[in-house]
């Protein structure tokens, strides 16, 4: 497992902690108890990552090797920044020679070597600003974007799939040949047009669900490996159907 890019709090906490009732609603108390007793939350604190999401990327990379050799990385929906932390480390990015560009409409504390844009990725100016910020051609586009949930599963799925589609078209527009694209999606079916587009442009398209993604969560990740290049992609037939792991 890849080590933390920065030092972290080594104190840790014991699992099985309870939250006092106080004024919290039962549902809020259960969520808080699950959060503070989550082993991935505790590992993130111990290893210096900003969120447990770091381990989702690390687990996917452990099997699919998407970080190795990446010279420049773009991180969409970056806040609070755990994926950007990993990206900065694997690319040896520094403030003097930044090789990671990140974007989110939420605030994010600075990370050495990461150029951060506080901007909605759906803003028409966002793609060009990211291209300027990265200062070269990225080998990897990451997207952990998800629309705010409404509680209505189909609505949440459609809204997050829209973000995934926009991210995928952006990746095809900016990636270096041989590059990879990883994006969050929700279980419930991936739109055929999106899958067909990815199959035309990448050598392999699969769905993955890392162990650190909570079992009850509908979250999955769509991984497209081996970008064929823009000219070649326009003339080739689609690759095999996307597989689920």
From Swiss-Prot:
PANTHER family: RIBOSOMAL RNA METHYLTRANSFERASE (PTHR10920), RRNA METHYLTRANSFERASE 2, MITOCHONDRIAL (PTHR10920:SF18). This is Ribosomal RNA large subunit methyltransferase E. Gene3D superfamilies: Vaccinia Virus protein VP39 (3.40.50.150). S-adenosyl-L-methionine binds at residues 81, 83, 104, 120, 144. The lineage of its organism: Bacteria, Pseudomonadati, Pseudomonadota, Alphaproteobacteria, Hyphomicrobiales. Keywords: Cytoplasm, Methyltransferase, rRNA processing, S-adenosyl-L-methionine, Transferase. It comes from Sinorhizobium fredii (strain NBRC 101917 / NGR234). It catalyses: uridine(2552) in 23S rRNA + S-adenosyl-L-methionine = 2'-O-methyluridine(2552) in 23S rRNA + S-adenosyl-L-homocysteine + H(+). Specifically methylates the uridine in position 2552 of 23S rRNA at the 2'-O position of the ribose in the fully assembled 50S ribosomal subunit. Its EC number is 2.1.1.166. The active site is at 184 (proton acceptor). GO terms for cellular component: cytoplasm. Residues 1-25 are annotated as: Disordered. Pfam families: FtsJ (PF01728). It is found in: Cytoplasm. Belongs to the class I-like SAM-binding methyltransferase superfamily. RNA methyltransferase RlmE family. Residues 11-25 have a biased composition (Basic residues). One of its GO terms (molecular function) is rRNA (uridine-2'-O-)-methyltransferase activity. Its main location: cytoplasm.
